[in-house]
């Protein structure tokens, strides 16, 4: 992928479900382009289809109509295995709940994507320690999730998303399960990482104040995505 190729591009994206003889369109012709280093927020009411959109853009679900391209490659042209490889190469994911494996340390959780990819264990540990240090958890490498605070667990999840050096991190309500103070810290961290690493961030959030801190803001309403 060269610098002029969008990290992610959606064109005329439609997601519809059958309801008897009718078709219910949850997304209606969504258009979106994400370039290298962008940081954008997507807001919308509960049930507006934000998570559905994120799943389509991340290659985790199939659109009814329209197209999604990751790093210039159309997802529709790939089988599931090829889509997985493309997704793992270019995208990282953060969710409202951290989904850390409780029996493993912070370092081991972050290293997991690299080990699955087949990297050398020594390289995995070094890279994971480096990214945990960057998110402010250097002294907590050997702690298991049960010994970490909610904010620290979410920092580990962010580090895990970043460890493969993705072009884009897709975050679905990443601070929705945190108290106000901790949420503000995690929000500031993502903005800082975007600025320092050049990693693009797409953040789905109900927090309009957080969204306002992102240079690009979109609202999903009635199946349509519009820039604010």
From Swiss-Prot:
Sites where the protein binds ATP: 44-51
What topology does it adopt in the membrane?
Peripheral membrane protein
Question: In the UniProt record, which is one GO cellular component term?
Answer: plasma membrane
Q: Name one Pfam family in it.
A: ABC_tran
Q: Locate the ABC transporter domain: which residues?
A: 8-228
GO terms, molecular function: ATP binding; ATP hydrolysis activity
Ligase keyword on record: no
Which residues form each disulfide bond in the chain? none
Q: Which residues cross the membrane?
A: none
Q: Which CDD domains match?
A: ABC_MJ0796_LolCDE_FtsE
Instruction: Tell me where it resides.
Output: Cell inner membrane
Leader sequence range is: none
Q: What does this protein do?
A: Part of the ABC transporter complex LolCDE involved in the translocation of mature outer membrane-directed lipoproteins, from the inner membrane to the periplasmic chaperone, LolA. Responsible for the formation of the LolA-lipoprotein complex in an ATP-dependent manner.
Q: Its family?
A: Belongs to the ABC transporter superfamily. Lipoprotein translocase (TC 3.A.1.125) family.
PANTHER family per the record?
ABC TRANSPORTER ATP-BINDING PROTEIN MG467-RELATED (PTHR42798:SF2), LIPOPROTEIN-RELEASING SYSTEM ATP-BINDING PROTEIN LOLD (PTHR42798)
Full protein name: Lipoprotein-releasing system ATP-binding protein LolD
Q: Which organism is it from?
A: Alcanivorax borkumensis (strain ATCC 700651 / DSM 11573 / NCIMB 13689 / SK2)
Q: What is the lineage of its organism?
A: Bacteria, Pseudomonadati, Pseudomonadota, Gammaproteobacteria, Oceanospirillales
């Amino acid at each position: 992928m060269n610098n002029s190729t969008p990290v992610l591009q959606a064109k005329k994206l439609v997601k519809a479900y059958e309801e008897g003889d009718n078709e219910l369109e949850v997304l209606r012709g969504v258009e979106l382009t994400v370039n290298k280093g962008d940081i954008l927020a997507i807001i919308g009411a509960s049930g507006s289809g934000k998570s559905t959109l994120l799943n389509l853009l991340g290659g985790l679900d199939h659109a009814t109509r329209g197209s999604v391209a990751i790093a210039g490659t159309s997802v529709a042209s790939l089988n599931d295995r090829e889509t997985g490889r493309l997704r793992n190469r270019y995208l990282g994911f953060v969710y409202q709940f951290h989904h850390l494996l409780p029996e493993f340390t912070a370092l081991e959780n972050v290293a997991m994507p690299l080990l699955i990819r087949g990297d050398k264990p020594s390289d995995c540990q070094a890279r994971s320690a480096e990214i945990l240090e960057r998110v402010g958890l250097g002294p907590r490498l050997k702690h298991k999730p049960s010994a970490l605070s909610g904010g620290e667990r979410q920092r580990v999840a962010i580090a895990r998303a970043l460890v493969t050096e993705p072009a884009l991190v897709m975050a679905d309500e990443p601070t929705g399960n945190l108290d106000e103070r901790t949420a503000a810290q995690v929000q500031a961290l993502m903005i800082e990482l975007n600025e320092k690493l050049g990693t693009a961030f797409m953040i789905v959030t109900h927090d309009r104040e957080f969204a306002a801190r992102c240079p690009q803001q979109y609202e999903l309403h009635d199946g349509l995505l519009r820039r604010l």
